A protein has these predicted regions:
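Structural signature for solvent-exposed beta-strand/loop edge elements and short helix-capping sites
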Residues: 1-213
Length: 213
């Protein structure tokens, strides 16, 4: 496919029967846009799959990912990371114990408890997608968006970091702790820039500012 794979290391052990290469010390696996570095890598030529198990780093044009264990397929551009996972982008940091990431699309697939932190917000999610190039998230399973003492949650959540807009759908709850009020409904729109939020579809507003809602 015009995408050459290069594999470097201090020591190489290759089994011709299984076609598995074990590379140790200062290991580097590179293709055109992606570099994986570790001290212990096994590469399966049949499956075209490299995996590390003693800590590693995957870097592309957008993001740097580190974890204790991981695997990367140069053919599909898919990678899987487990244990102490961190994705670092100039705009945000995503931490998790399990994460899938595609180096072609730059989409991170959240499949376990994860935190996404930026200067603008904090997101907690256990399931969904983060489009790292676009700065957008599509999240499920009661994910939570927090910003300046305000939290937005719903059965599903959409967030656009560049626009500073969050939208929640079904069984929505927006809590404004500084102003002591809450919105509920089945849809809520929240603008971080203006601090404005509104809810629709069985919407209800609750004011706690007087000590009696």
């Amino acid at each position: 496919q015009g995408d050459t794979l290069a594999l470097y290391g201090d020591y190489l052990f290759y089994d011709g029967n299984t076609q598995i290469a074990q590379v140790r010390n200062n290991v580097r696996m590179e293709n055109r846009t992606t570099t994986l570095t570790t001290d212990s890598l096994n590469y399966d030529r049949v499956a075209n799959l490299g995996y590390f198990f003693d800590g590693g780093t995957l870097m592309d044009e957008e993001n740097v990912l580190t974890s204790d264990w991981g695997e990367y397929s140069p053919a599909t551009k898919m990678s899987v990371f487990n244990y102490e996972v961190k994705l670092v982008n100039p705009q945000f940091t995503l931490t998790s114990d399990t994460l899938r990431y595609n180096t072609a699309t730059k989409i991170a697939s959240i499949v376990g408890p994860s935190d996404i932190d930026s200067d603008e917000s904090h997101i907690y999610s256990e399931l969904g997608f983060y489009y790292t190039q676009q700065g957008q998230a599509e999240l499920l399973n009661r994910s939570v968006l927090s910003n300046g003492g305000k939290t937005l949650t719903g059965d599903s959540l959409f967030y656009d970091r560049n626009k500073g807009v969050g939208e929640a759908f079904r069984n929505v709850e927006f809590i404004d702790a500084p102003n002591k009020n809450m919105l509920t409904g089945n849809y809520c729109h929240y603008s971080q820039n203006s601090g404005y939020a509104f809810a629709t579809d069985e919407a209800m507003a609750v004011d706690f500012s007087q000590g009696d809602s």
